[in-house]
Amino acid sequence: IDAPDRRDDFEGIWRRLDRRLLLLAFGVEPDKVAGLPRIGVDGRPWFDDGTVEISLLVDAPVTATLRTSLESVGLRIEGSDPRRGIIVGRIPVDRLLDLAALESVRRATPSSGA
């Protein structure tokens, strides 16, 4: 029996992606989404060249295998606390739903430096 495609698990995706990220994933322009940060933790604009900076809560500890699976959906990891399962990184907006489909992702929210 084939495993279900988790991208079709809207309820799970809704729980994992912050509402603002979900709106972006559905194609809403960033300037139309209330409450988005202007600057990321990395000091760059939060929305930059089609990417957004996010904070993730994932299954702990963060292993090399988990990092590889996150990178395979387009996440560029900028920092982490492997023991606690916290990661900060940048991801293309069009890959947010792929990220949320990963079994190991618990929650994704916008990161903010300001």
Which functions belong to the PLM regions below?
Residues 1-114:
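Autoinhibitory N-terminal propeptides
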